[in-house]
């Protein structure tokens, strides 16, 4: 939900998705006569329509149903929204949730383009990478029994992937940004028209520059650790090798402390994955090296990038990580697993180090190498390449061209 809408409804603004708000603002600024509407979903039962700062907002109700399951009743709401706003073009951001599919099924003749963020149908293959079946069974918790364990988490990705593929076979135009998403989209729907356009990131990350002199030496920063796909366990597996050489190493992890047991509520809500992580940390006596920062807004996220010695993206799969893009834009030394579209974001050694996801020893070596060399790290080329990739004006001009080309095509 966009910040102006959240504030108007008295709802806490979401930390994620800030890049989308930046993109919407840029779209309005570059097209002063544009009529823009933004639609989203929420758990309640009433359709909300609001106009704020020249933008019309529609909030479609899920009536208490999960956003991961297909809700046929959304089709009628989409028809209401379409009739009220009468859009020339509809841009669906992301394929991960089925409310976009509901729009396309309700209005099959509408002019639509879909942006690829991640591809859940592909990510499902790698959901539990690095974790054995035995480890999953050994760490099932009460919360898993009620809400679903790691196996069911993967199953949910698979089910959502069915909706995703359905959506991609129904549309004629898609926007992507990596060789990875291009290959997979074309495999799903060969005739689809693929339009390349890079992402514009959040404003704060264009305004600062990392420096070795002001960073906290021998620290790592991870922006996510909540579920297996993000690769936190791989960092923990690499950590014993790292602290043998750099015993003062610290890992800052953005987000809630998934292993906290301070309250009964923490214990009750602990997932099997969190239990596995906690056991691993205890077994290898790693707790002193790990600091969960709590949820971070844009400014505080930026501060942690700047204070850290290295940014690591250890995911088992990514399309193009916005976190990696933010780190590169700031000039933080970067390491990423060689998965998905990571190679497109790290085309040269100046932009970072790539390693194979499974090779935790290689990850450890990459970290130790950067610890040693970061005093003389020259981030000029990385920042230049990243600034070109995430150039807000250039990306907005490209998006405008895509919109115009699609409208002419229909």
Where is each model-derived feature located?
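N-terminal subdomain of nucleotide-sugar transferases
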Residues: 1-45, 51-56, 393, 404, ...
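Conserved acidic donor-binding segment of nucleotide-sugar-dependent glycosyltransferases
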Residues: 348-349, 353-360, 369-375
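Nucleotide-activated donor-binding/catalytic signature segment of Leloir-type glycosyltransferases, i.e.
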Residues: 265-295, 299
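Short alpha-helical donor nucleotide-sugar binding micro-motif in glycosyltransferases
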Residues: 82, 295, 303-308
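A charged, aromatic-enriched C-terminal amphipathic alpha-helix characteristic of glycosyltransferases
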Residues: 375-410
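Conserved donor-binding/catalytic core segment of Leloir-type glycosyltransferases
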Residues: 211-230, 236-241, 251-254
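Aromatic "clamp/platform" in nucleotide-sugar-dependent glycosyltransferases that forms part
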Residues: 316
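Short hydrophobic beta-strand element within catalytic cores of glycosyltransferases
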Residues: 333-336
């Amino acid at each position: 939900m966009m910040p102006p809408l959240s504030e108007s409804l008295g709802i806490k603004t979401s930390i994620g998705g800030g890049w989308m708000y930046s993109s919407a603002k840029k779209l309005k600024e570059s097209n002063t006569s544009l009529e823009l509407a933004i639609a989203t979903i929420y758990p309640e039962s009433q359709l909300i329509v609001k106009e704020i700062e020249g933008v019309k907002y529609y909030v479609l109700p899920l009536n208490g149903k999960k956003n991961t399951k297909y809700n046929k009743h959304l089709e009628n709401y989409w028809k209401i929204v379409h009739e009220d706003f009468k859009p020339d073009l509809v841009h669906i951001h992301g394929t991960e949730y089925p409310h976009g599919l509901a729009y396309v099924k309700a209005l099959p003749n509408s002019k639509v383009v879909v942006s690829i963020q991640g591809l859940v149908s592909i990510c499902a293959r790698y959901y539990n990478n690095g974790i054995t079946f035995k480890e999953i069974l050994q760490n099932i918790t009460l919360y898993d029994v009620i809400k679903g364990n790691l196996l069911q988490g993967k199953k949910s990705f698979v089910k959502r992937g069915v909706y995703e593929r359905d959506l991609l076979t129904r549309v004629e135009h898609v926007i992507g940004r990596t060789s990875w998403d291009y290959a997979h989209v074309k495999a799903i729907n060969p005739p689809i028209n693929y339009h390349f356009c890079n992402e514009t990131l959040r404003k704060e990350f264009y305004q600062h520059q990392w420096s070795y002199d002001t960073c906290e030496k021998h620290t790592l920063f991870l922006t996510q650790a909540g579920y297996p796909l993000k690769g936190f366990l791989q960092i923990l597996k690499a950590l014993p090798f790292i602290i043998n050489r750099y015993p003062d190493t610290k890992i800052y992890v953005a987000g809630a402390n998934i292993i906290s047991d301070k309250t009964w509520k923490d214990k009750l809500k602990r997932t099997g994955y969190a239990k596995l992580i906690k056991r691993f940390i205890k077994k290898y006596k790693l707790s002193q090296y790990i600091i969960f920062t709590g949820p971070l807004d844009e400014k505080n996220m930026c501060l942690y990038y700047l204070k850290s010695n290295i940014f690591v993206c250890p995911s088992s799969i990514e399309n193009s990580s916005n976190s990696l893009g933010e780190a590169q834009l700031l000039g933080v030394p970067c390491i990423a697993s060689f998965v998905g579209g990571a190679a497109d974001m790290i085309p040269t050694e100046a932009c970072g180090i790539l390693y194979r996801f499974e090779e935790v020893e290689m990850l450890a070596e990459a970290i130790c190498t950067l610890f040693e060399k970061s005093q003389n790290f020259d981030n000029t080329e990385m920042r230049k390449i990243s600034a070109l990739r995430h150039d807000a004006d250039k990306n907005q001009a490209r998006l405008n061209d895509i919109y115009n080309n699609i409208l002419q095509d229909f």
